[in-house]
Curated annotation (Swiss-Prot):
Residues 58-71 have a biased composition (Basic and acidic residues). PANTHER family: VEXIN (PTHR31520:SF1). Transmembrane segments: none annotated. Required for neurogenesis in the neural plate and retina. Strongly cooperates with neural bHLH factors to promote neurogenesis. It comes from Homo sapiens (Human). This is Vexin. Residues 56-100 are annotated as: Disordered. Keywords: Cell membrane, Membrane, Neurogenesis, Nucleus. It holds the Pfam family Vexin. It is found in: Cell membrane; Nucleus. It comes from the Eukaryota. Belongs to the vexin family.
């Protein structure tokens, strides 16, 4: 006699077949046989209750299942009308291609919206070139005004800086962000040195 034991895990269901001789002589073997039969029933019930996969996917993984299940599944597949598959296949590309084209159009429109309008107009007309030049001039003027403000702020914070160091200050960014650490160290050293030299000079001046 053949008994099948089903073991269920999170991934698949495995089937183990055990062959037991039909002639059972001792009552111990009968008890073992009945307990094994109950065990197989319990395992099958648990596998039906606690399976995590959908029932449609189980026949695809049935490499170790009975051939009867395979035959049944094959009959179900052949019983379906063959005209349903081409209709689905022909309907799917239309549904998929429409969002793709809309996405492409949306991306193109989004990309066009990101491009500034001034270079596009400057290619077509010469009047817009003057507009672009004035826009660039205003931007440069704004940057220069910001740079002069930062330079003024730096001169107020570091009054003992030499003229070359003031000229080499960055136009944008604050003193802590835009200035590198090496230049800050050099400026602080020069400041301390100038204060020290001034103190010694004032000591040797005549009263």
């Amino acid at each position: 006699m053949m008994h099948q034991i089903y073991s269920c895990s999170d991934e698949n269901i495995e089937v183990f077949t055990t062959v037991i001789p039909s002639k059972v002589s001792s009552p111990a073997r009968r008890r073992a046989k009945s307990s094994q039969h109950l065990l197989t029933k319990n395992v099958v019930i648990e596998s039906d209750l606690y399976t995590h996969q959908p029932l449609e996917l189980l026949p695809h993984r049935g490499d170790r299942r009975d051939p009867g299940d395979r035959r049944r599944f094959g009959r179900l597949q052949t019983a379906r009308p063959p005209t349903a598959h081409p209709a689905k296949a022909s309907a799917r590309p239309v549904g998929i291609s429409e969002p793709k084209t809309s996405n492409l159009c949306g991306n193109r429109a989004y990309g066009k919206s990101l491009i500034p309008p001034v270079p596009r107009i400057s290619v077509k007309t010469s009047a817009s070139a003057s507009l672009e030049a004035t826009a660039m001039g205003t931007e440069k003027g704004a940057v220069l005004m910001r740079g002069s403000r930062h330079l003024k702020k730096m001169t107020e914070e570091y009054p003992a800086l030499p003229q070359g160091a003031e000229a080499s200050l960055p136009l944008t960014g604050s003193a802590s962000c835009g200035v590198p650490g090496i230049l800050r160290k050099m400026w602080t050293r020069h400041k301390k040195k100038s204060e020290y030299v001034g103190a010694t000079n004032s000591a040797f001046e005549a009263d």
